[in-house]
Amino acid sequence: MVAFMNSATFVAGLFTLWSRPIWATPASNTNAVVVNGTAFTLNGDHVSYRFHVDDATGDLFSDHFGPRVSGNFPTEIVSQVNGWVNTIGRVRREFPDQGRGDFRIPAIRIRQTAGYTVSELLYRSHTVIPGKPALPGLPATFGSEEDVTTLVVHLYDEISEVAADLSYSIFPKYDAVVRSVNVTNQGAGNITIETLASLSVDFPYEDLDMVYLRGDWAREAHSERRKVEYGTQGFDSSAGYSSHLHNPFLAIMNPATTESQGETWGFSLVYSGSFAVNVERGSQGFTRALLGLNPGQLSWVLRPGESLVSPECVAVYSADGIGGMSRLLHRLYRNHLIKSKFAVSDRPVLLNSWEGLGFNYNETTVYQLATEAAELGVKLFVLDDGWFGDKYPRTADNAGLGDWVPNPDRFPHGLPHEVDRITALHPGNDTSTNLRFGLWFEPEMVNPNSSLYHQHPDWALHAGSYPRTLTRNQLVLNMALPEVQDYVIKSVSDILDSADISYVKWDNNRGIHETPSPSTDHQYMLGMYRVFDNLTTKYPNVLWEGCASGGGRFDPGVLQYFPQIWTSDDTDALERITIQMGTSLAYPPSAMGAHLSAVPNQQTGRTLPITFRAHVAMMGGSFGLELNPAHMPDDERDAVPGLIALAERVNPIVLTGDMYRLSPHDSQWPAVLFISPDGEQAVLFYFQTSPRVDNSIPRVKMQGLDPQAVYSVDGDAEYSGATLMNVGLQFPFDSDVGSKVVFFQRL
């Protein structure tokens, strides 16, 4: 342990040109974390993350987050103007607390019993841990001692008696640093955590751009790029879930960075509740980026001895542009975030009943739809909303939520009987396999027209006597209550135990409005994570899919438990290109649910060719159908078995391969290439989205291939990787809207 002076002696150490060595050896589990005195370096294969303790005060100052470095490292020289004393407001800080002259956004703000919000969290000690400890009650990345090493830096405020343990886990193979903080009240009185960021990064003086995802229902994940201006800018969710409006993801890059070239930093918060992302360029030109819990939904009281652990935030660095950043996140999440056995397993082609039947069905029509699905070669039949409710049957969206018992009017012989009939069907008349059965749930919600609400109105979130506002005729259950968590676990378990159910679609169709306190949002998510963990552990052979009116909760927190998420309720293929490519900035395509739907499309009214619709959906890890085959034209119905076979051929590459966005979503010719992990196979998805008269045919240039290797293109022509990447190929289209799926095989 090192003793440090108090803040009164800060200035003396602030102007010291401080230099200590960084050892330049390949990153591994033995040198991923290098400690030299009180200078700390985390090394990935291509990245270094470095900070040090100020000798005079014990404050943590940031040095470098970027390309891997070695040797002696100079820290910032802080300017002095007209004799004025410099403060920590002029330096790059690692975990900025409130007060003491730093007027930028803090990573932590604590209100003490006396009302003070000043903190002085200074270095006390550090610990290096092989591997990575779990975060109590929260989703988190994981790995063995060979995969990851963790540095914990222990800070302490002697006046308030508050401790903060900063956790840094380095995954060298993925150039990823994962950060979180654990705050403990070691004093005698209560304190209130008003702000807590999982990660704060101060970038050096330079111009930067930022990219983020915005949207709304049915138009999620639209990417936006803008210059980082002086002052503050940012986005958040206050809806109690990550939401359609913004995603807990941020990318920072140099203005010259493109999809394939240039420095890019990616930040992804492993959390599903209300969050905040703030970016501030200060007067000195430094840019500070913070991601964490939303301060407006926090006010977390810590009694003596209690702790608050932040969600973790993943930070990656790539010199290979925005695409390089995305591929690092994809690989990390596939291998070290998603716990499900289905993370990289081939997904069954499914048919979901919602757009085909809606609420209008009974056991006869359900069986008929399942039979038609099996005849087409579908492997999994999913019965969506409407199957439950006894006294308050779910025949529309205004009743039944909360009463998770099968509707006896729809299923007079019982739901297990219906499941048995459906799972006796054979996909494509292949008697060696049986059709699987899945079911839709929305367990976090309750209708006022339900037995549950009449028995437990207090279980619905509310704020005293204020009106309980409805969305889609429903209220939100208070998942912070252990009795509500236990009810949900038992209700879902009873259904899964009653029949051969191999898939669950878990929906969430509204945000949180009224709560008894700001901290309820985070308490809700902790309760929700307990439910997710319990059920997915109890039923590991069930394929779980997340949903929140589409992609309203498409975030890393959900991916810990559910390997796939319904990307959007918008199934229009042209719209989906934008939504899926935007989602892929942070999330692996393996996690995306994407379906071929009927035309005219229910959301846009647009009619597109069936091959185009199917090819767009194949770019998601979970390909399915969202229609009623009985209503399809004969030529489209006849095409479905071949499209399913194609989807099953590309699915292993989409699930496990690297994704290259060759041409942007707003191009007339969007293009995406997937390359298998061994580099032996690749598949190109290429689209024409609008007609051109007498226009030259563009070339699409591949990326990520071996320039020295030779590849066959659809088993025909052969070209070198260098030719495919530098010259490219032309693909003519014979209609105004068209698509191609092209296979490459390394010879």
Swiss-Prot record:
Keywords: Carbohydrate metabolism, Glycoprotein, Glycosidase, Hydrolase, Magnesium, NAD, Polysaccharide degradation, Secreted, Signal
Protein name per its UniProtKB record: Probable alpha-galactosidase C
The EC number(s) this enzyme carries: 3.2.1.22
Tree of life domain: Eukaryota
Cofactors demanded by this protein: Mg(2+); NAD(+)
Function: Hydrolyzes a variety of simple alpha-D-galactoside as well as more complex molecules such as oligosaccharides and polysaccharides.
Organism encoding this protein: Aspergillus terreus (strain NIH 2624 / FGSC A1156)
InterPro entries found in the cross-reference section: Aldolase_TIM (IPR013785), Alpga-gal_N_sf (IPR038417), Alpha-glycosidase_related (IPR050985), Glyco_hydro_36 (IPR002252), Glyco_hydro_36_C (IPR031705), Glyco_hydro_36_N (IPR031704), Glyco_hydro_b (IPR013780), Glycoside_hydrolase_SF (IPR017853)
Leader sequence residues: 1-24
GO molecular function: alpha-galactosidase activity
GO biological process: polysaccharide catabolic process
Residues glycosylated per entry: 36, 182, 190, 362, 429, 449, 534
Active site: 507, 569
Subunit-level organization: Homotetramer.
